[in-house]
Amino acid sequence: MSTADRYRKVFPVTWEQLHRDAKALSWRLLEKGPYKGIIAIARGGLVPAAVIARELDIHLVETICISSYQWQEQTSSHKVLKTVEGRGEGWLIIDDLVDTGGTARLVREMLPEAHFATVYAKPAGRPLVDTFITEVSQDTWILFPWDSEVQYVVPLVNQPQQS
């Protein structure tokens, strides 16, 4: 399935909104802790993990590095670039988003005892995470602030109509 077919909508997230949503996630996670530390899924989970680490006063932050996207195309293969030891007991895994669940499934297999939280969740991946804040439809591309910049956009009325 091509990107054009898969993503029919774009959901832009600002730095302020991401911070607000990550803090809201922290409120939900507060009652489920305490945690030994955070395992951030790089790269998308790094910024939310920093906010959550501050809010939960967690000083130990590890990373697991998995490559699955090439721009807007999600690849079918996941490349594990860095992992962590253990089964995840007492640890909090943080990612920005669970989409199709490919990355989440792989991390769940590696760290089955960790608590898995994401800021945003799509229906296909939602069952793989324990806690999330905002659900977004499967056909929506979430445009994170680290992937965008402020620029002029043509008003909707002047844009070509999509079927």
From Swiss-Prot:
Source organism, top-level taxon: Bacteria
Swiss-Prot/TrEMBL cofactor(s): Mg(2+)
Keywords in alphabetical order: Cell inner membrane, Cell membrane, Glycosyltransferase, Magnesium, Membrane, Metal-binding, Purine salvage, Transferase
Compartment list: Cell inner membrane
Main location: membrane
Residues that hold xanthine according to the record: 99, 142
Transport among keywords: no
Catalytic reactions of this protein: GMP + diphosphate = guanine + 5-phospho-alpha-D-ribose 1-diphosphate; XMP + diphosphate = xanthine + 5-phospho-alpha-D-ribose 1-diphosphate; IMP + diphosphate = hypoxanthine + 5-phospho-alpha-D-ribose 1-diphosphate
EC number: 2.4.2.-, 2.4.2.22
Entry protein name: Xanthine-guanine phosphoribosyltransferase
